[in-house]
UniProtKB/Swiss-Prot annotation:
It comes from Coccidioides immitis (strain RS) (Valley fever fungus). It catalyses: L-glutamate + acetyl-CoA = N-acetyl-L-glutamate + CoA + H(+). Its EC number is 2.3.1.1. It is found in: Mitochondrion. One of its GO terms (biological process) is ornithine biosynthetic process. This is Amino-acid acetyltransferase, mitochondrial. Residues 1-47 form a transit peptide. Pathway: Amino-acid biosynthesis; L-arginine biosynthesis; N(2)-acetyl-L-ornithine from L-glutamate: step 1/4. Signal peptide: none annotated. The gene is ARG2. Residues 558-727 form the N-acetyltransferase domain. The keyword Cytoplasm does not apply. It holds the Pfam family NAT. It is an enzyme of class 2 (transferase). Its main location: mitochondrion.
Length: 737
């Protein structure tokens, strides 16, 4: 199967794929037995009974919505229906071939060889990754080798061998990709919603992302009552997962230990029982109950602390070493542990939804490196004040002041100039929570993601979304009349979309008008943006000059101005960034000489992973007489917008830079040009206020300034500048304009 065929999977029609179960025997885990009174609901041996869980053989939620398997179908028919729903959801969640290629590179099968004659073990990693193969004589989705090993390897019987501590690392030779999920207050979810959540988690597991779910029942009742609720909801979730015709669930309710009931320094009792079911492709459900070492009694633990302890264990940071162990041995142990697991996602399923902004819509994307302190301060103030209502008249009760970073934060909030008319535009009254408890919950979620992601690699990310949104997108489209057979469009699942793309559900740099505000959302008083928040540890953002200190404005004659020779600018890295992004060699001397007299500022993301060079351009025919009228007509121009090729399409680098430009540096507007055949133009179209194809040229002009078509003088100034810019490429060749 060619790689082009594999990467074209998302454009093929969806057909059922036959599933073949291969028998597999997994070694029994005999190491680190639990202490007295410590009970593991799961043994590493798949055949071991689970006495603490009793569930019906088939769990079918009471739902009349379309897209669910009819209840009168047999077991095989429901399996086929679930299979079809899985591929439909998968195909609808994919976006581009580049994103599919990125997903393949992150989740490709790892080739390994046995060490020291030890027989290699190929554990089962879920139906999709190891069991699916193309059936030419029956309808199927041609995924080629996208999710599976070669046919010879897949059909080779897996050898049986007993577990020994010396061979423990052999079991986890293939790296496990894990999503650590916190499900908040599942007792408030109806069966239909919980079924949709479970279906999505099963689909994530089949796509190679093993799920470990921590139950969070809240703090509304006493400890004894909450412990009972936690166990009941864990059983309930496990039953729904098992009814989804995918990977089975495995419930663990005593893998966490604490020194005492008053010392909440949590740690994982044993690594093996946690990784073993994940390696086998099971969905792990963790009850937040641990045992105190001093009393050997069960203690209900804070769910956030359980998530944090599990994240450190999965990241290989909880090292158990003896006092006489040398540093080399310890380092090798840490290295081996980190090769076993890749903790890729921290998922918070909370009815409260994404992180809100007290001034505007919920945050779509948070760059923790740049925004955490500002957003945490804002939420802390909200938890103290408790209520914010912005009505049609523009008045607000308990309105929160803009934080110290305010408009200088590129992703935190929309600047006042751009979205001040939002409530009037939507014709609605936008209300925030009526007490501070909801803001405190959001702050807890943000703090949890900040703590966990600070320990994880930069590639790891977090997402906060409501269970209802996940469940709604997990449904099939509603059937209409049987005559027309017209069906509504299937919604993209935010978790599957995030897995495939490693991006937020909506781009953080999209203007509000591009978000597709629906009438039903307007009437319900909901935010037009999706109520989910994508969180990355991210990267620092440098803006020169700093807008918090100096507003970006055209300089008067004789005033000192920023140049590319400034010692704060790493010119060789900037030139490399531009050349790598455009794929062309830059005439560096010509470029520096052209930019220096007119440089407005520079935006740099991370270690020159992305950036923008902005200038003040003089309209043709206008001479600098030093007057205010001349400075007022200077055109803010985006000369170069560049992202390293390895960072394009992932990590939100482009969004970070673009938001800084249009919301912080030039909130009143900026213009730029792009060749008419530039594939990035679609991205520009979505984020600009207007475009104009320059007659007689191969250029398209874009702007974010308000009222450009109505202001003819400004329009012709913009067009004149875009026509007159002289390129600085070393090859001296360019397309005919």
């Amino acid at each position: 199967m060619s790689r082009s065929t594999v990467l074209g999977w998302c454009t093929q029609s969806c057909r059922l794929l036959q599933k073949h179960d291969h028998s597999f025997s997994f070694p029994t885990f005999n190491g680190s037995p639990p202490l007295k009174k410590r009970r593991f609901c799961d043994s590493a041996a798949p055949a071991a009974p689970r006495p603490s869980i009793h569930r019906p053989s088939e769990y079918i939620p009471h739902s009349k919505s379309g897209g669910e398997a009819p209840q009168d179908l047999g077991h095989k028919a429901r399996e086929k229906e679930a299979e079809k729903e899985f591929y439909l959801s998968l195909l609808c969640s994919a976006s581009t071939k580049r994103e599919a290629k990125s997903y393949l590179s992150r989740f490709k099968a790892q080739k390994t060889t046995a060490n020291d004659g030890c027989q290699h073990i190929t554990p089962r990693r879920g139906d999709l990754i190891s069991d699916l193969e193309l059936m030419k004589d029956k309808p199927g989705v041609n995924l080629g080798s996208m999710f599976s090993e070669t046919r010879t390897v897949a059909e080779t019987p897996a050898p049986k061998q007993e577990w020994s501590s010396a061979q423990s690392t052999e079991l986890f030779r293939e790296k496990i990709h894990v999503a650590l999920v916190k499900l908040r207050k599942p007792q408030l979810l109806d069966d239909q919603t919980l079924h949709g959540v479970a279906k999505t988690l099963v689909q994530l597991s089949r796509l190679g992302m093993s799920c470990c779910i921590v139950i969070d029942v809240g703090t509304d009742k006493d400890e004894t009552h909450r412990r009972i609720i936690a166990r009941e909801q864990a059983d309930r979730l496990s039953a729904v997962i098992d009814a989804n015709h995918g990977p089975d669930s495995r419930q663990l309710d005593s893998i966490i230990t604490v020194p005492s009931a008053t010392d909440m320094k949590l740690s994982v009792l044993s690594r093996g029982p946690l990784l073993s079911p994940l390696q086998q492709g099971h969905v792990v459900v963790v009850v937040p109950v641990g045992y105190a070492n001093d009393t050997q009694r069960a203690v209900l633990l804070p769910a956030n602390e359980v998530v944090f302890a599990l994240s450190k264990e999965l990241a290989g940071l909880e090292l158990r070493s003896g006092p006489d162990e040398d540093a080399t041995t310890t380092a090798n142990k840490v290295n081996d542990m980190q090769k076993q697991v890749s903790l890729d996602r921290i998922i918070i399923l909370d009815p409260a939804g994404g992180i809100p902004s007290l001034q505007r819509r919920p945050h779509v994307f948070i760059n923790l490196e740049q925004e955490f302190e500002d957003i945490a301060r804002e939420l802390s103030l909200g938890s103290q004040t408790g209520f914010l209502s912005i009505n049609d008249s523009g008045t607000a009760s308990h309105k929160m002041p803009v934080s110290s970073l305010g408009k200088s934060n590129p992703i935190s909030i929309f600047v006042e100039e751009e979205l001040v008319s939002l409530p009037k535009t939507l014709g609605e009254s936008q209300e925030m929570p009526r007490n501070g408890k909801r803001f405190a919950e959001h702050l807890e979620n943000l703090n949890l993601l900040q703590r966990t992601l600070s320990y994880l690699p930069p590639s790891s990310s977090g997402i906060i979304v409501t269970p209802h949104e996940v469940a709604l997108s997990a449904k099939g489209p509603l059937n209409t009349s049987a005559v027309s057979a017209v069906r509504t469009r299937r919604q993209r699942n935010p978790l599957i979309h995030n897995l495939l793309t490693d991006k937020p559900f909506q781009s953080a740099s999209l203007p509000l008008g591009r978000l597709g505000v629906k009438s039903d959302c307007m009437s319900a008083g909901q935010s037009p943006a999706t109520h989910s928040t994508f969180v990355k540890r991210g990267m620092p953002l440098t803006m020169l000059p700093d807008p918090r200190v100096e507003v970006w404005a055209a300089k008067k004659r004789g005033e000192p101005a920023l140049t590319l020779d400034d010692p704060r600018i790493d010119l060789p890295r900037l030139i490399h960034l531009i050349e790598d992004s455009f794929g062309r060699k830059l005439d560096a001397r010509h470029y520096v000489d052209r930019i220096n007299p007119r440089l407005a500022g520079l935006i740099i993301a991370g270690e020159y992973e992305g950036g923008a060079v902005l200038t003040w351009e003089t309209p043709p025919g206008l001479s600098d007489d030093g007057s205010e009228e001349f400075r007022a007509r200077m055109v803010p121009y985006l000369d170069k917008f560049a992202v390293l090729k390895r960072s394009q399409g992932a990590g939100g680098v482009a969004d970070i830079v673009f938001n800084a430009m249009v919301r912080t540096c030039f909130p009143q507007g900026v213009c730029w040009r792009s060749r008419a055949n530039n594939p990035v133009n679609k991205w520009y179209f979505e984020r600009s206020r207007g475009t104009w194809k320059l007659p007689g040229t191969n250029w398209t002009m874009f702007w974010t300034t308000a009222g450009v078509p109505e202001n003819q003088s400004r329009f012709w100034d913009y067009e004149g500048v875009c026509r007159a810019i002289e390129p600085s490429w070393a090859d001296k060749t360019q397309q005919a304009d």
